[in-house]
A protein has these predicted regions:
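N-terminal Sec-pathway targeting helices
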Residues: 1-13
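Bacterial N-terminal signal peptides
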Residues: 12-22
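N-terminal "domain-start" segment that seeds a small globular fold
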Residues: 26-57
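Signature tryptophan residues that serve as conserved aromatic anchors
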Residues: 49, 70, 87, 137-140
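Short active-site neighborhood of thiol/selenol oxidoreductases, capturing the structured segment around
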Residues: 55-78, 84, 98
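Thiol/disulfide oxidoreductase modules built on the thioredoxin-like
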Residues: 63, 120-126, 130-175
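Structural microenvironment flanking redox-active thiols in thiol-disulfide oxidoreductases
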Residues: 78-122, 132-138
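Short, solvent-exposed cationic patches
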Residues: 176-181
């Protein structure tokens, strides 16, 4: 009986923990949502730009912009990458500008040489800013790798998606924004 009690408490706590997790689990709609058309905050605080000179939102005004927060060892980011590549290839000629914000999760991910190698290995040709001190991350209120933000031609965040999935909806939002004046 004493041995049974030794198993019962951990089992009960595990079941309660699982129930709490299920209650707190976000709905499928929670990770993709239209934003309330708030002005984007920009890229101040980045330590280094790759594939471009530093860019500002003022320079990007008039373009539809996809901002992707990522880091090169994140499996979610690596799973999102082929879609970002497709959107860049398909929609850049129509005016889509992709900007990567590389925010490292681990110290080695912040080394410029490692980021350059990852950009080359992943065949990233769009501008990428390194955000080693999380200044851009925090200014945007970001919390996830990967996170996608779509900006309209006025520089306002009008759509956001956290994590993987819902690629058709994100692409539909890109198309909608590109069709808008």
């Amino acid at each position: 009986m004493a041995a049974l009690r030794g198993y019962a408490l951990p089992l009960l706590l595990g079941l309660l923990g699982g129930a709490v997790l299920l209650l707190a689990w976000p709905s499928p709609e929670a990770d993709a949502r239209p934003a309330q058309a708030v002005p984007a905050t920009g890229f101040d605080g980045g330590v280094r730009w790759h594939n471009s000179l530093p860019l500002t939102l003022k320079q990007l005004r008039g373009q539809v912009v996809l901002v992707e927060f990522w880091t090169y060892t994140c499996s979610n980011c690596l799973n999102v990458a082929p879609y970002v590549h497709q959107w860049h290839a398909r929609y850049a000629p129509q005016g889509l500008k992709v900007i990567g914000v590389h925010t490292p999760e681990f110290a080695h991910e912040g080394l410029p040489g490692n980021v350059r190698k990852a950009i080359a290995r992943l065949d990233i040709t769009w501008p990428v800013v390194q955000d080693n001190q999380y200044r851009i991350w925090n200014a945007w209120g970001n919390r996830f790798w990967a996170a996608l933000y779509l900006l309209d031609r006025q520089g306002r965040v009008v759509y956001r998606h956290d994590g993987e999935g819902d690629y058709a909806r994100t692409e539909s939002e890109i198309q909608r924004l590109l069709a808008s004046p």
